[in-house]
C-alpha cells in the first residue's frame, strides 16, 4: 500500500513541503500531522529519537519489516484489504427506492468533497481540497460521490493511484443514511472499476471495520501496526 502512497506524495509535494518527508538509506517517512507513515526500516532507538524531534505522536509501519521505535507501545492493528486487478465483486444489496433516488457524480468538485469529509474542521478541509486538486490534475486520484438532490450524501476515493496500486480511503456516508448499504455499494463499484482498468485497489482499515470489508468480499492482504509515543 505504501508503495503507492509515499512515492506519489513525495513526487507531488516534496519540493513545496520538504519538511513532510524524510528519505534515508533504508527508511522513508511521510509526516501527516502528528502521525508518521514509515516504509523500510531503521534503528529503533534512532527512529524513536527522530520521531520525537518531529513531534510525532504515532507511527504506522509494517512490523515485519520495521522494528517499532524504542519505548513506543502498540496502539492498534490496521488491516490491508484489496481486490486483485481484473476481479469483480458482487454489488451489495441496497433498497431500490433509496438507490434510485441517488445520482453518481464521478467528478465531484474538490471543495464539495472536502466539505463533506471535514465539515467542522476548516484546516483539514482546506488541506484535503488542495491535495485532491494537486493529485487529480495529474491523473493520480479518483473520487466519486453520491448526490441526493443538491446534497452530497456519500463519497469514496482512490487518493493515490501509482505503481499499479490505487489507495482507497475516505469512504463516508451522511449520518441519516448510514447503515443502509449505499457506502458499501459505492466502495465496491469504485473498486470494481479500478480493477477493470488493471489497477490494484487497496485500503487500510481500523479493527472495527474489518467485518464490514470482509463482508463486502475484499481479500485481506496484510497488516500494519500503529504505535503510539510513550
Where are these regions (language model features)?
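A conserved beta-turn-beta hairpin within the catalytic core of GNAT-like acetyltransferases
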Residues: 32-37, 160-169, 178
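Acyl-donor-binding surface of acyltransferase catalytic domains
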Residues: 39-98, 102, 205, 225-229
Amino acid at each position: 500500500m505504501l508503495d503507492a502512497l509515499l512515492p506519489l506524495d513525495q513526487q507531488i509535494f516534496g519540493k513545496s513541503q520538504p519538511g513532510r518527508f524524510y528519505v534515508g538509506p533504508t527508511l522513508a517517512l511521510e509526516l501527516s500531522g502528528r502521525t508518521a507513515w514509515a516504509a523500510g526500516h531503521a534503528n529503533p532507538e534512532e527512529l524513536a529519537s527522530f520521531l520525537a524531534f518531529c513531534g510525532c505522536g504515532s507511527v504506522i509501519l509494517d512490523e515485519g519489516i520495521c522494528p517499532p521505535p524504542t519505548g513506543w507501545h502498540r496502539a492498534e492493528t490496521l488491516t490491508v484489504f484489496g481486490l486483485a486487478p481484473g476481479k469483480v465483486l458482487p454489488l451489495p444489496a441496497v433498497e431500490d427506492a433509496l438507490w434510485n433516488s441517488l445520482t453518481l457524480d464521478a467528478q465531484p468538485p474538490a471543495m464539495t468533497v472536502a466539505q463533506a469529509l471535514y465539515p467542522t474542521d476548516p484546516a483539514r478541509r482546506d488541506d484535503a481540497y488542495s491535495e485532491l486538486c494537486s493529485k487529480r490534475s495529474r491523473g493520480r486520484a479518483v473520487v466519486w460521490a453520491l448526490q441526493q438532490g443538491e446534497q452530497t450524501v456519500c463519497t469514496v476515493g482512490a487518493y493515490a493511484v501509482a505503481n499499479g496500486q490505487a489507495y482507497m480511503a475516505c469512504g463516508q456516508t451522511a449520518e441519516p443514511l448510514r447503515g443502509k448499504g449505499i457506502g458499501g455499494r459505492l466502495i465496491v463499484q469504485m473498486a470494481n472499476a479500478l480493477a477493470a482498468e488493471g489497477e490494484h485497489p487497496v485500503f487500510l482499515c481500523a479493527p472495527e471495520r474489518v467485518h464490514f470489508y470482509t463482508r463486502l468480499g475484499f481479500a485481506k492482504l496484510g497488516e500494519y501496526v500503529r504505535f503510539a509515543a510513550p
